[in-house]
Amino acid sequence: MSESGTLTNKESDTKILSVLVSDPQKQKTHSQTYITYQVSTKIDGKDEPNCVVRRYNDFVLLHQILINDHPALLVPPLPDKKVLNYLSGDRFSHSFTQKRCRSLQTFMRRLLSHSELSKSRILETFLTSTDWDVYRRSLTGQISTSEVSDVLINAFKHVNRQRDEFVEIKEKSEKLDHNLSHLDKLFHKSVKRVDLIGQNLKKLQSSLSGLQELCCDEKELSNSIKAFNDGTMQLIDSLNDLNKYVDYEYNVDIKDMINYIEALKQLIRLKDQKQIDYEELSEYLTRSINEKNNLLSGYGSGNYFKSKLEELAGINQEMARRDKIAKLETRVQSLTDEVEKSKQVADEFEKEVLKEVEQFEQIKTLELKDSLAALAQKHIDFYDDMVEKWSKIEERLESA
């Protein structure tokens, strides 16, 4: 990697306290339209936050560099690129940009929660540098994806000897993924139903307004209808606010957690690939040793007809046998070294993954707890507000 690339492997001395991703803005140039986000970083020892503007593609580059430089670490995932939104033009809609902003905020929070990734120099550069565009151009073509390719190629191979810890981790991940996916579907249906209820309430409110006009001569009845209609309008506004929170924040949090679990699965698959490499090398070494031992015992790996053909061709079988043995000894020695290296790599990678799983569990538990607590508080606030407002409506109805 070039000098600009070596920067990514260094640790930062800057202590980052918090990061806020906000203010998505639509930008236009002569050739393209895109969304930018303001990234505000609070740094220890500085009174004012450092603010920079980044595009989604800048986050993508940061993500790729972190994966490239830390293959054994669980780098949080970015929000998916919604292909349908891009085709329909909805990627510039308020809903799309706000949801993506929420996901990018989650991405940054997870990076800061990670014991090693939070110290990455590239993260500091991303958050504070005014020359990010120059740095980005200097890295063009240097990001490797070979590890991911290896995992895809060996997607149908399985580890022969899987540790019980990883069997349990996989089972727990699958179960959590299944439950969250079910929740995701339920809350998406809930958002649509509440939206439909809101539309029906608007129709009711419109009808009540018409009825109020018809009863203008009957002051008492007109006041009662107006009081009830005011309550209906307040209910519509509060219900829309609650539904927007569920749609823009809670549902996004669930989806981000599902993606986080998938990133963990991908890391475990990469760990499995290291184990598969070791197992395949070990099997190849065993076959080579057996073949050499057979030749030393005089049996050889060839059949009777092959021996006769070699004899008719004037090949000295004893010399050929010694030749094969020498080649096999060289191969066995080389494979023995490779197996030892592969075993060391697999074991070290496994240890790192176990550490990552532990950090994932901590971050996951905190996020789910905070997300559910915020959802519960939003509902509590909604019902408290409705009790207060409708109590006042009731007083108006009684005094009408």
From Swiss-Prot:
SUPFAM superfamilies to which the protein is assigned, alphabetical: PX domain
- What are the record's GO terms for cellular component? cytosol; early endosome; endosome membrane; phagophore assembly site membrane
Present the record's domain note: The PX domain binds phosphatidylinositol 3-phosphate which is necessary for peripheral membrane localization to the perivacuolar punctate structures.
Q: Name which cysteines form disulfide bonds.
A: none
Keywords from the named record: Autophagy, Coiled coil, Cytoplasm, Endosome, Lipid-binding, Membrane, Protein transport, Transport
| Residue span(s) of domain PX | 15-134
Which is an annotated Pfam family here?
A: PX
* Source organism (scientific name): Kluyveromyces lactis (strain ATCC 8585 / CBS 2359 / DSM 70799 / NBRC 1267 / NRRL Y-1140 / WM37) (Yeast)
Which purpose does this protein serve, as stated in its record?
A: Sorting nexin, involved in the separation or division of vacuoles throughout the entire life cycle of the cells. Involved in retrieval of late-Golgi SNAREs from post-Golgi endosomes to the trans-Golgi network, for cytoplasm to vacuole transport (Cvt), and autophagy of large cargos including mitophagy, pexophagy and glycophagy.
Source taxon at top rank: Eukaryota
Q: Which GO terms describe its molecular function?
A: phosphatidylinositol-3-phosphate binding
Binding annotation for a 1,2-diacyl-sn-glycero-3-phospho-(1D-myo-inositol-3-phosphate): R55, K81, R100
Can you say what this protein is called?
Answer: Sorting nexin-4
Please list the GO biological process terms of this entry. autophagy of mitochondrion; endocytic recycling; piecemeal microautophagy of the nucleus; protein transport; reticulophagy
Topology relative to the membrane: Peripheral membrane protein
Q: Where in the cell is it found?
A: Cytoplasm, Cytosol; Preautophagosomal structure membrane; Endosome membrane
- Entry's SMART domains? PX
Record-stated family: Belongs to the sorting nexin family.
Task: Name the coiled-coil region(s).
Answer: 319-356
